[in-house]
Amino acid sequence: MESQQLSNYPHISHGSACASVTSKEVHTNQDPLDVSASKIQEYDKASTKANSQQTTTPASSAVPENPHHASPQPASVPPPQNGPYPQQCMMTQNQANPSGWSFYGHPSMIPYTPYQMSPMYFPPGPQSQFPQYPSSVGTPLSTPSPESGNTFTDSSSADSDMTSTKKYVRPPPMLTSPNDFPNWVKTYIKFLQNSNLGGIIPTVNGKPVRQITDDELTFLYNTFQIFAPSQFLPTWVKDILSVDYTDIMKILSKSIEKMQSDTQEANDIVTLANLQYNGSTPADAFETKVTNIIDRLNNNGIHINNKVACQLIMRGLSGEYKFLRYTRHRHLNMTVAELFLDIHAIYEEQQGSRNSKPNYRRNRSDEKNDSRSYTNTTKPKVIARNPQKTNNSKSKTARAHNVSTSINSPSTDNDSISKSTTEPIQLNNKHDLHLGQKLTESTVNHTNHSDDELPGHLLLDSGASRTLIRSAHHIHSASSNPDINVVDAQKRNIPINAIGDLQFHFQDNTKTSIKVLHTPNIAYDLLSLNELAAVDITACFTKNVLERSDGTVLAPIVKYGDFYWVSKKYLLPSNISVPTINNVHTSESTRKYPYPFIHRMLAHANAQTIRYSLKNNTITYFNESDVDWSSAIDYQCPDCLIGKSTKHRHIKGSRLKYQNSYEPFQYLHTDIFGPVHNLPNSAPSYFISFTDETTKFRWVYPLHDRREDSILDVFTTILAFIKNQFQASVLVIQMDRGSEYTNRTLHKFLEKNGITPCYTTTADSRAHGVAERLNRTLLDDCRTQLQCSGLPNHLWFSAIEFSTIVRNSLASPKSKKSARQHAGLAGLDISTLLPFGQPVIVNDHNPNSKIHPRGIPGYALHPSRNSYGYIIYLPSLKKTVDTTNYVILQGKDSRLDQFNYDALTFDEDLNRLTASYQSFIASNEIQQSNDLNIESDHDFQSDIELYPEQPRNVLSKAVSPTDSTPPSTHTEDSKRVSKTNIRAPREVDPNISESNILPSKKRSSTPQISDIESTDSGGMHRLDVPLLAPMSQSNTHESSYASKSKDFRHSDSYSENETNHTNVPISSTGGTNNKTVPQISDQETEKRIIHRSPSIDASPPENNSSHNIVPIKTPTTVSEQNTEESIIADLPLPDLPPESPTEFPDPFKELPPINSHQTNSSLGGIGDSNAYTTINSKKRSLEDNETEIKVSRDTWNTKNMRSLEPPRSKKRIHLIAAVKAVKSIKPIRTTLRYDEAITYNKDIKEKEKYIEAYHKEVNQLLKMNTWDTDKYYDRKEIDPKRVINSMFIFNKKRDGTHKARFVARGDIQHPDTYDTGMQSNTVHHYALMTSLSLALDNNYYITQLDISSAYLYADIKEELYIRPPPHLGMNDKLIRLKKSLYGLKQSGANWYETIKSYLIKQCGMEEVRGWSCVFKNSQVTICLFVDDMILFSKDLNANKKIITTLKKQYDTKIINLGESDNEIQYDILGLEIKYQRGKYMKLGMEKSLTEKLPKLNVPLNPKGKKLRAPGQPGHYIDQDELEIDEDEYKEKVHEMQKLIGLASYVGYKFRFDLLYYINTLAQHILFPSRQVLDMTYELIQFMWDTRDKQLIWHKNKPTKPDNKLVAISDASYGNQPYYKSQIGNIFLLNGKVIGGKSTKASLTCTSTTEAEIHAVSEAIPLLNNLSHLVQELNKKPIIKGLLTDSRSTISIIKSTNEEKFRNRFFGTKAMRLRDEVSGNNLYVYYIETKKNIADVMTKPLPIKTFKLLTNKWIH
């Protein structure tokens, strides 16, 4: 919008408080809040003074016209909304104040915002004019784009306008703490100076330069009150204001006095603490400088002893002098003079090698008397510039920040400009300190730097050979890792991140491009005149313009201060739209240490403390700049969150107010922590801590008890330590009133030593806050260290001691020093430190034999207090040792943690950090002959007797006694240890054994149990049923489970929605029993099974055994007989072979019962359950004999491997209560968080793909207008229950693509924010299977579609707010949601209603009644699952027409059009489908199972003997109570949820033969006994062995044009505990199995007929619903049939006898069945039990029967 003059509009009425402000349209890549520098009206002191002394009426207010000033519009015109921030109500610069109004009133009456207070923009008088100012405080300013219309008509006008530009006035920040007042005052003084009020600021002598006016005093008071709230003022400021609330000048005067009170001593201490020497200056100059500082400090009473001085000097040595830093390890009494002798020797050797001069050694007398001073040759120079020169020559242009570059390429440019610098410009204003600071760019989107002297401009530099810019926003065609070296005048390297093109669009509509380098490490953006000259552009300082050689004016030049600038508005921005991840490669020497690594190294201290420590050199070896702090703000350490979780913090200021000031080590605080229970006797149960009041130095001592003599020993030790080490005497010890402190023995001891005990008063916990906070901090650190490292709990005090060492070395933010510095000790050298629990290999110098390994695995604890070694815990020796003979265990294999801390061990960084110390140790350490046998004096764990660990990764194979094949030895596994096992061993309770963990094998005879109703396809139903006998012991391999889902709504593993439909029951699946019924051998069984696997290309053979189908009554008509034959004809029923009696050998008949040992093995047995052992079997040798290594379940989980664990409290789990409690399977997280996918992902390729997915998701969110970008809300203004947390999750889909999704935390969403009655509907699996079956029979085309970001198309009705994504950097703001974000409770329902409406209204579809998400019209059928659509049509063009309509509204992607006549492969909702139109369809999950099953942490047997059935009959789950540890119980329940969840998902999809076993185990999720776990492993093993099986469908070849829908029903009477019956049904459409159901009967049946009636009654409703669906999708006639193997049930259904039943419940069911059968034209027929394929749904079957019933439909 073009700016308009004030004269075009009438004056605004006097009654308006504020007026609308117009603004110019800005470029799309420019911040709409940015204002051109030319829009700021010039202001000076003269005009201020003049305006303050005159009065002008509003009508006579004259404002000079300026085309760059925005003029007001009438009040009726609404203010424009150009950005995400609302326009503030403010008055324009050309608007006069209403008459009779003065903004100088009481402060509470001020109607304007704080940033309108500066007299820089309006004169301080009643008739002042208010300027336009950015609406967001602190928003950087920039110039408008060339399209905004702000062009210059000629060079003279441009010169006049631009030269009048003044710098902006930014308001000071708000004061938020009394401690921040000194820093705030500096910014406030600078604000006054920038507002041309510097003359009123008091000088050093306390007097201002000029007298302050009343208006200025009012302005001073008002701004001080607004920006410095009274509650955050220091006490001394409040005291001044209490006397005179307007005396701001006195506050400023006193603040300036405090700022000027920095003494020479403080400067000398800072200089001494930051010494740096590398030999670039003479050694005697360095010595003179240091000795002068030390002498001055000593003369002023600050004593610097030789030890401290040497440590400070050596810490600053670098280069060839660096090795002297470690001489303190060899010479503890070295003096400063001796140290400088070594420095002089090295320096003179260097000079001698350069100049061939003899070495020179100085005498100490020379050192004392030498008072020469040397100039530091590396001191940066500030070049004086002459801005008055107006020569047009290029060589005399303004010079600024000259740099030189060298490119490592054939065309080398090594221009070196002398007398130039990249140091900050010499500022006219001494308070503009921030302008010279080194800048670091955290993002690449900044178009401006608010700290620039002239923001939004480039500094013209005649000396720079290259153009440098800090922001990548304007860089085109950027490429990272440029091979370019850039140096300044002092030959210091400037790191370059990228190189690209800088494109200009000048006002004559010409475009020009020059090369530019990107670096954030310069003070200003530099534009090289040399590079401009190369493209025929010169700078004319006469006219102050950039022009071409022909005189064409391109852009004006701004003269600001002593330099010349050009606006950035002529730069064309690049197409960067979102922040990018900085992957700029740096060399080894410049690569920074990751913050999480330093965080873990320093005992998990917070970032603020670590930064203070590095700034103040309390941590040595590297500086603050060596750490990458980019992730410090948002980084959340999981171990800290777990270990340091607390309710609230202690009250601050807890020390007594009447406490006097003491010298160091005269006033101590002490407290005792403990006891820690369940530890071995050798480990301490308590610790006592001491804290010095003055220095905050801490000590900790272990205690085994709280007896008087134990406490007295500690007091004696610490008092002697303080007296000898610090030459101090303790005067007061503060403690609580515990009996350990108030006893007579300790009281007499303190009295004897002249120490005053200071006890806390009653109910005065605040007085003991120092000791309480220390104990809490140390305990938090202890929990965090143990959690992170995985070390056993008996090492808890080692974690306490490690934390104490680190805490004493970290600087306090308040005192800026560490406790060690206060105590006069040197800082902690971090290169000598290892992370707590770091895996190491310790050298064993005295092994048991010469061939015994020399390395012992161990875990580093903390540095030794008595040597230069390290305390290391050796689990194999059950002790800790003090040694230096260790090597850090490297690689990904050595990770200790359970939170996927792949990036937190940082082997490479650790090597760099400890390299120098390791080399020093290697060259200087004294070999200790008995190193490993010397235990630490505080090695309180040394004598702990540990039980040996159970073997890990032991593979065994059970061999049948009749099997001639010897067992596998598996030597490969014995040589290879699982990588995940390299972890600190957990503790194992020596008192826990199988006898008190495993339940007994007795079964209750009179149980009582209630029922749980079942749902389709098994899973969650309680089944107190025996499980089948396991087949054979499988070889085991350890693995981890990390399933990858297909998407975030439906995955190929399982989801919460789908498990609600997958509750499939099972019958007796395994277990143990004292008696085992003999079975036929495997070989004989195989001979008796007739395999009839049908060919895929040919149609299945006709069933020729129809004579086995026995009708209930003879059909009276040929039609009924044909109907029966038609129903039976195409069913996949087994072909029964002719039977012959089986004779067993005589010895077998005499075989006594064999006691089973299956409950002690991993899979339930030591041999093949189908094999026989004869009495006459001969004994075998040890090699040939059957062996079994019993592997406990605990040894498979590497996280639970513990070397020692005290007795824990047991939890009793009752079977009935556990089974009752099972409601649903808890979904397992299959996605990655941001830190896992990107931040700490060491897989570079995968990380880049996730970054790309992240950017794609952010762009999609912005494109879909997901939230309101016009307004941002403060968190305090919004009801917390309407605020939804959000996060990014990442996932790798099955097709290999990487996915990122921004989701809401709906799991913690408040119920008031959504309608609980709304449902998120998805297509039922039976509907999908029915559609697929009809597609095969009718030669349909199948098209698969995907709608990207489907939920974002649905509007949200509720008022909800989310926190902005992290890249926006607005942590304290909220944005309002406009779309249904993924994860919200109502998002699924909103999307369903949206897409349903579109399909019906725009696509002409209608939803099938009773089957949600199934839509149809005359040609097309659609199955909808969230954003996946499956289209079925006989005409492919009909599908394409639907796709075209969908693309008009939604981003629709065609996954598979399905137009080929050959075999087409689909991945539909987790099913891997192979479909050849008109021939066959195969449904399986081989690829998915091959990927997921090995990750379940279950031992699989990929090459050994395969299981032939998921279980065997004859064994039962024990009913006894399960006594188990609490933690172990939770862990096993979690594992059961994971295993059964995946198995339920697979069984629900297509493995209907497993539903019985899945249902049974699912009911025992909360009863994870050893037996239940073994049976679950056996089921997973069978799924692995049969992962290649598929559900095979062939195209139906009917004799009649009818659809045949059949349900086969079966029930097992009383085969469940407590006389419950198992029922099962299988549903077939045109001979193809489309679904199955297995569950336990809800009522207790009293006969087999009642059980069968119950099963039939469960099948008929679903059969009728499927019939309706088939008729809607296919208009052919349908024949419905029901098959059961119960003649009595069929008789009752078909009978017309209405006599009373003996049981009213089943009588009601029977009568209902009669009505349903007769009313729905349902045919009921008998099927022989041997051919009833539903038998697999109700009971465990022998291998032969199981194969016979399933190999016709799944193989």
UniProtKB/Swiss-Prot annotation:
Its EC number is 3.4.23.-, 2.7.7.49, 2.7.7.7, 3.1.26.4. Mg(2+) 2 binds at residues 1346, 1427-1428. Residues 1338-1476 form the Reverse transcriptase Ty1/copia-type domain. It catalyses: DNA(n) + a 2'-deoxyribonucleoside 5'-triphosphate = DNA(n+1) + diphosphate; Endonucleolytic cleavage to 5'-phosphomonoester. Residues 1610-1752 form the RNase H Ty1/copia-type domain. Residues 1044-1053 have a biased composition (Basic and acidic residues). Keywords: Aspartyl protease, ATP-binding, Cytoplasm, DNA integration, DNA recombination, DNA-binding, DNA-directed DNA polymerase, Endonuclease, Hydrolase, Magnesium, Metal-binding, Multifunctional enzyme, Nuclease, Nucleotide-binding, Nucleotidyltransferase, Nucleus, Phosphoprotein, Protease, RNA-binding, RNA-directed DNA polymerase, Transferase, Transposable element, Transposition, Viral release from host cell, Virion maturation, Zinc, Zinc-finger. Residues 1-10, 48-60, 127-152, 402-421, 1005-1017, 1031-1043, 1054-1082, 1101-1111 have a biased composition (Polar residues). Residues 1-93, 126-173, 352-421, 956-1087, 1092-1111, 1130-1186 are annotated as: Disordered. The keyword Nucleotidyltransferase applies. The active site is at 461 (for protease activity). It is found in: Cytoplasm; Nucleus. CDD domains: RNase_HI_RT_Ty1 (cd09272). The capsid protein forms a homotrimer, from which the VLPs are assembled. The protease is a homodimer, whose active site consists of two apposed aspartic acid residues. Capsid protein (CA) is the structural component of the virus-like particle (VLP), forming the shell that encapsulates the retrotransposons dimeric RNA genome. The particles are assembled from trimer-clustered units and there are holes in the capsid shells that allow for the diffusion of macromolecules. CA also has nucleocapsid-like chaperone activity, promoting primer tRNA(i)-Met annealing to the multipartite primer-binding site (PBS), dimerization of Ty1 RNA and initiation of reverse transcription. This is Transposon Ty1-DR3 Gag-Pol polyprotein. The gene is TY1B-DR3.
